[in-house]
A protein has these predicted regions:
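Small-molecule kinase domains that catalyze NTP-dependent phosphoryl transfer to phosphate-bearing small molecules
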Residues: 57-66, 74-78, 158-202
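ATP-dependent small-molecule kinase phosphotransfer cores
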Residues: 40-112
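Pre-Walker A (Motif I) flank of P-loop NTPase domains
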Residues: 1-9, 111
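ATP-dependent NMP and nucleoside kinases share a basic, alpha-helical "lid"
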Residues: 99-155
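Strand-loop microenvironment adjacent to phosphate/nucleotide-handling motifs in alpha/beta enzyme folds
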Residues: 90, 135-137, 145-147, 179, ...
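Short beta-strand-centered segment that lines the nucleotide-binding/catalytic pocket of NTP-utilizing
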Residues: 29-40
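Short, amphipathic alpha-helical "lid/cap" segments that border enzyme active or binding sites
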Residues: 101, 202-210
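Glycine-rich phosphate-binding P-loop
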Residues: 6-22
Length: 216
């Protein structure tokens, strides 16, 4: 049985829901937003800052300067990011990525689990404490029309805005992944399976993944 299942996903493909069901089927923990909380606790970065910027910025000093203005303390011009001195030396994007990477490794070392997003497939592959043979990397995608409908239903958006948001979020996810892993997001060479969640629906897709994890 595969002990660690990573779920990379396009926005609107149902990856979070699928990952949650997989975890229940296997009787193991499911981690998504928990990664943000742990990363914030260990790094000193504010949880809201991590959540807002985890896929919005790329590595480099320019983005540190750019974001610094947005998070300056009013009337002082000084940065206030809720971070400790140990993290403040690195570019903000690197701080966010490193904090989440460390959180993913900490959670995985506790035992078998399902992890959604945040380059977890790449992080676990390069973690010496985790055997690569125990990892199942899944990429969930869906047709654009289905993802747009998902955004309309869950976010209450009009069709045009929903399509724009779907494309923008997927672009951000791709840029983030490509920047920090030097891989190509969604490239089949980096995953064990690429699954169109629209074919079977979320629940059946999740049960299929769980069965594969049990038998592989």
């Amino acid at each position: 049985m595969k002990k660690y299942i990573t779920i990379s996903r396009e926005y609107g493909s149902g990856g979070h829901t699928i990952g949650s069901i997989v975890a229940k089927e296997l009787g193991i923990p499911f981690y998504d937003n928990e990664i943000i909380d742990l990363a914030a606790k260990d790094s000193g970065l504010h949880p809201d800052f991590i959540k807002k910027n985890e896929q919005n910025i790329s590595s480099g000093w320019f983005y540190t300067l750019l974001l610094g203005a947005s998070y300056a303390t009013p009337g002082t011009g000084s940065m206030h990011l809720g971070m400790n001195s140990a993290t403040s030396a690195a570019p903000l994007a690197d701080q966010v990525f490193n904090a989440q990477r460390n959180a993913i490794i900490q959670l995985a070392k506790k035992g078998p689990c399902v992890i959604v997003g945040r380059c977890s497939d790449y992080v676990l592959r390069h973690c010496e404490e985790i055997d690569r043979k125990d990892i199942l990397n899944i990429f969930i995608y869906a047709p654009l029309a289905d993802k747009v409908q998902y955004a309309i239903k869950t976010k209450g958006l009009d069709p045009a805005t929903a399509e724009r948001d779907v494309k923008l979020i997927d672009k951000r996810r791709a840029n983030h992944y490509n920047t920090f892993t030097e891989r190509t997001w969604g490239n089949r060479a980096h995953y064990d399976m690429l699954i169109n969640s629209s074919l079977l629906g979320m629940e059946k897709t999740a049960k299929m993944i769980a069965q594969i994890a049990k038998e592989s």
